[in-house]
A protein has these predicted regions:
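Extracytoplasmic/secreted cell-surface and envelope-processing proteins
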Residues: 2-3, 31-35, 47, 72-73, ...
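Conserved positions at the start
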Residues: 9-11, 50, 178
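Fold-independent oxyanion-binding glycine-rich loops
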Residues: 25-28, 65-67
Length: 218
């Protein structure tokens, strides 16, 4: 669900399978897309290899992935090497799933961990979704309520608009509640309002974000 990386890479991707689907990836990832805690001052891109497995049956979908990034940027990343040894790799595994109770209500969860980082190496998300927007359907709407824990040394470029790490506000990451509503007032026009309230990891400082966006689709 974008807990680890929601970003394109330069390279190759191969997918195969039906109900059980596998995706193999390899290439280079632009570190300018990484969060503020990782940065890209010592290296412009990371070597990347990954594998994803996904399975869907009825109302249930589950998945797991393994990703490896190699770059000198991890040697100087914030709280990445507190043990004293300079590690230049990120080895990240993640699992997730979603269950749809009916056409309107769904519960999703995801967890990820970087086994090479010393700190800020775990992330997790639990989200309850109600309905959902469809850009071609004027008047459609959806809402979600989530609790997220986003560590910057594992969530390198998360998809969430309100997590502060993705917005380069914090080098540590955050934990807290995230609420969002989407509405389609006109065909191919999506409006979104999101609110996050929680604390910054490490410092425990209170953080909150109110985020709004209007998107046009052609």
């Amino acid at each position: 669900d974008g807990l680890v990386v929601d970003s394109f890479f330069s390279g190759a991707q191969v997918s195969f399978g039906n109900k059980l689907k596998a995706t193999l990836e390899a290439g280079r990832w632009d570190l300018s897309n990484a969060n503020k805690g990782i940065g890209a001052t010592t290296d412009k891109a990371a070597n990347y290899q990954g594998i994803e497995l996904g399975y869907a049956a009825g109302n249930l979908s589950v998945g797991a992935s393994y990703r490896q990034f190699s770059s000198d940027a991890f040697k100087v990343a914030n709280r990445y090497n507190t043990s004293g040894e300079l590690e230049d790799k990120a080895t990240i595994w993640s699992v997730g799933g979603k269950y749809r109770f009916d056409k309107n209500l769904a519960l999703a969860g995801a967890y990820a961990q970087n086994t090479k980082a010393d700190e800020l190496k775990k992330s997790g998300s639990v989200e309850l979704d109600y309905k959902g927007t469809k850009n071609s359907d004027m008047g459609s709407w959806g809402a979600y309520l989530a609790y997220r824990h986003v560590g910057t040394n594992v969530s390198l470029a998360p998809t969430y608009s309100t997590d502060h790490a993705g917005g380069n506000v914090t080098v540590y990451g955050t934990k807290g509640f995230d609420l969002g509503i989407g509405y389609v007032p006109f065909k191919n026009v999506l409006t979104q309002v999101q609110y996050f309230r929680g604390k910054e990891l490490v410092t425990d400082d209170k953080v909150q974000t109110l985020y709004g966006r209007v998107s046009f689709f052609f």
